[in-house]
Amino acid sequence: AEEQSFSSTKFSTDQPNLILQGDA
């Protein structure tokens, strides 16, 4: 759950590319 929350925030504030690759 923590990772998901962190990813969500990162995706919104940080580069979505990193999150997309990590999530995919």
Curated annotation (Swiss-Prot):
Sample GO molecular function, one term: carbohydrate binding
Keywords: Lectin
Superkingdom, taxonomy of origin: Eukaryota
Comp. bias intervals (Polar residues): 1-18
Sequence segments annotated as region (Disordered): 1-24
Family per similarity comment: Belongs to the leguminous lectin family.
Oligomeric form and interacting partners: Homotetramer.
Name the UniProt record assigns to this protein: Lectin
